[in-house]
């Protein structure tokens, strides 16, 4: 993978000139000049997904110049490097092969000359056998009762992905009740334990090293709670399984290593839902539906790795994102799913994007002088419309938005879905085209309003428009289409990282806080006044000690 400063390319310089020409062009102008704009700036993925990127401040020339940037930064070579098992995560000397986890074609993928697919398939088969025993009731707890509840204990990628997917695919869930515990705040585990019965609960402890502070603190609390009821430590093996590679620590915890599900160092945490970390997904929706999830992602992998940049959906979305982030100065992107089951999708890709591309040092080790990852946030529609859309419509920040919705709902109650989708369509239209002063004035005149009131109120009712959006319309949210959608965003993030010349698959930014917390923890064990930090941190710790009693 080449290390190219994007700002030093001819394409970047051309884009800077092009931006000067485009900065005052409106989306309304672009539509007025081209009646075929939708057909030119939208694309389908099979019969599952329509991506409409026509309501953006782009022309065919913009896209051509952005694609030139991708070529100069050797995006094609980087894609090949990832899919072939090259160790593109150089700061950790690791391959990046979440694509191997969903490689349904089973074509060999090599790491250090060894095909990883036999091991991937072996773990999948083990997940299948285990999950079928739990779901069928064949697996019994220590009192002979079947499992009714599953508690996944993990954090970051070991929590966000499985939680997001099990929520998004709730229409496919079986009788098992799923719970997720991540926060080291004791409230999180305490509230979940109030809801479950030790005789019928299975705990999944998701930690590659089996040393993650938050996860192991929660796991030991769950174990203590369980043993208060079960008594004998030998019963732990019937109620705990591990998603880990540390067989020694897993065995010492009391878990039968036969119920330890492995994954590999080429699986990054925020890309791990496709691995053994997805066992909670399998237990929720069944193995066959999990395979459909993998198949949808694999289909997008094939699209990404074989489709030219001009028609490549992850590449197009990535390039448009760079256009706004680096030329228009937009610092943020909103992900707005119009589907309540998808309520954790934005949070999942908040980690996926910000932990991947939130870097200020390039692949050469130099501090960058351009923008890297955007701030990602969002909530489901229509809730967001009554919360933060005001700023998107009439604020001073540019917030490019992705609107996501299914054409077919899993809950066809009355006309709920038509009302939901009418808002989905209306919002992107309103953001793009706005509402002029002339229209507002005419509305007031038609209502017979007092002219003095009109002059005062009109400025507040004007919508400038020209706010960019993408619309992603799914036929229906199924395991297959969700898998494809997740992979679409994963590859968008990778594409941006390649072009921005940063390492997307490490996350050193999480380390310093952990190191300092480990230093502070012993200082909280007693009531002695602390003076070993800066005055602010000392003051906070000492007030905490005074107040805790």
From Swiss-Prot:
Q: Which residues form the active site?
A: 355 (proton donor), 386, 514
Residue ranges spanning the membrane: these are none
For this protein, the Enzyme Commission number is 5.3.1.9
In alphabetical order, the GO MF annotations are: carbohydrate derivative binding; glucose-6-phosphate isomerase activity; monosaccharide binding
Modified positions (N6-acetyllysine) are: 80, 228, 234
InterPro entries referenced in this protein's UniProt entry, alphabetically: G6P_Isomerase (IPR001672), G6P_Isomerase_C (IPR023096), Phosphoglucose_isomerase_CS (IPR018189), SIS_dom_sf (IPR046348), SIS_PGI_1 (IPR035476), SIS_PGI_2 (IPR035482)
Q: Which GO terms are recorded in the biological process aspect for this UniProt protein? A: gluconeogenesis; glucose 6-phosphate metabolic process; glycolytic process
Q: Where in the cell is it found?
A: Cytoplasm
According to UniProt, the reaction catalysed is: alpha-D-glucose 6-phosphate = beta-D-fructose 6-phosphate
Q: What GO CC annotations are associated with the protein?
A: cytosol
Enzyme class, broadest EC rank: isomerase
Q: What does this protein do?
A: Catalyzes the reversible isomerization of glucose-6-phosphate to fructose-6-phosphate.
Which PANTHER family does this entry report, sorted A to Z? GLUCOSE-6-PHOSPHATE ISOMERASE
Q: Could you identify this protein by its name? A: Glucose-6-phosphate isomerase
Q: Which organism is it from?
A: Escherichia coli O139:H28 (strain E24377A / ETEC)
Q: Which gene encodes it?
A: pgi
């Amino acid at each position: 993978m080449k290390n190219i400063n994007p700002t030093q390319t001819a394409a970047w310089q051309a884009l800077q000139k092009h931006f000067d020409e485009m900065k005052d062009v409106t989306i309304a102008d672009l539509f007025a000049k081209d009646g075929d704009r939708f057909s030119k700036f939208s694309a389908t993925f099979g019969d599952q997904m329509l991506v409409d990127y026509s309501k953006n401040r782009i022309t065919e020339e913009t896209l051509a110049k952005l694609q030139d940037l991708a070529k100069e930064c050797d995006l094609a070579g980087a894609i090949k490097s990832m899919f072939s098992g090259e160790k593109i995560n150089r700061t950790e000397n690791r391959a990046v092969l979440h694509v191997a986890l969903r490689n349904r074609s089973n074509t060999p993928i090599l790491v250090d000359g060894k095909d990883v697919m036999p091991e991937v398939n072996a773990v999948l088969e083990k997940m299948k056998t285990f999950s079928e025993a739990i779901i069928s009731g064949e697996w019994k707890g220590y009192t002979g009762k079947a499992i009714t509840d599953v508690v996944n204990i993990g954090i970051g990628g070991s929590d966000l992905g499985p939680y997001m997917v099990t929520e998004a695919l709730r229409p496919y869930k079986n009788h098992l009740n799923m719970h997720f515990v991540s926060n080291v705040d004791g409230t999180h585990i305490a509230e979940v334990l109030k809801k479950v019965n030790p005789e019928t609960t299975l705990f999944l402890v998701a930690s590659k090293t089996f040393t993650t502070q938050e996860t192991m603190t929660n796991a030991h609390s769950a174990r203590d709670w369980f043993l208060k009821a079960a008594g004998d430590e030998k019963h732990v093996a019937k109620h705990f399984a591990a998603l880990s590679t540390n067989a020694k620590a897993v065995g010492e915890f009391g878990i039968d290593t036969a119920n330890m599900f492995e994954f590999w160092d080429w699986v990054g945490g925020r890309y791990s839902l496709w691995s053994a970390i997805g066992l909670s997904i399998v237990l929720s929706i069944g193995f066959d539906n999990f395979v459909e999830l993998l198949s949808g992602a694999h289909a997008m992998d094939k699209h990404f790795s074989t489709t030219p940049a001009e028609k490549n959906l992850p590449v197009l979305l990535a390039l448009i994102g760079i256009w706004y982030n680096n030329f228009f100065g937009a610092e943020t992107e909103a992900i707005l799913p119009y589907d309540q089951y998808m309520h954790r999708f934005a949070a999942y890709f908040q980690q996926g994007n910000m932990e991947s591309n939130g870097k200020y040092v390039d692949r050469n080790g130099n501090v960058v002088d351009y923008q890297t990852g955007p701030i990602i946030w969002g909530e489901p529609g229509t809730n967001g419309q009554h919360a933060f859309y005001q700023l998107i419509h009439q604020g001073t920040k540019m917030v490019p938005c992705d609107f996501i919705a299914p054409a077919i709902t899993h809950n066809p109650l009355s006309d709920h879905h038509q009302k939901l989708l009418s808002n989905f369509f209306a919002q992107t239209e309103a953001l793009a085209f706005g509402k002029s002063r002339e229209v507002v004035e005419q509305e007031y005149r038609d209502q017979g309003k007092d002219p003095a009131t009109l002059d005062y109120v009109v400025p507040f009712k004007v919508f400038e428009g020209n706010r960019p959006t993408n619309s992603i319309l799914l036929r229906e949210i199924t395991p297959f289409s969700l898998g494809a959608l997740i992979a679409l965003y994963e590859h968008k993030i990778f594409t941006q990282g390649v072009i921005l010349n940063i390492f997307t698959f490490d996350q050193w930014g999480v380390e310093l806080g952990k190191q300092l917390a480990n230093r502070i923890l012993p200082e909280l064990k007693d009531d002695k006044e602390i003076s070993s930090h800066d005055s602010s941190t000392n003051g906070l710790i000492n007030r905490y000690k005074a107040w805790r009693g």
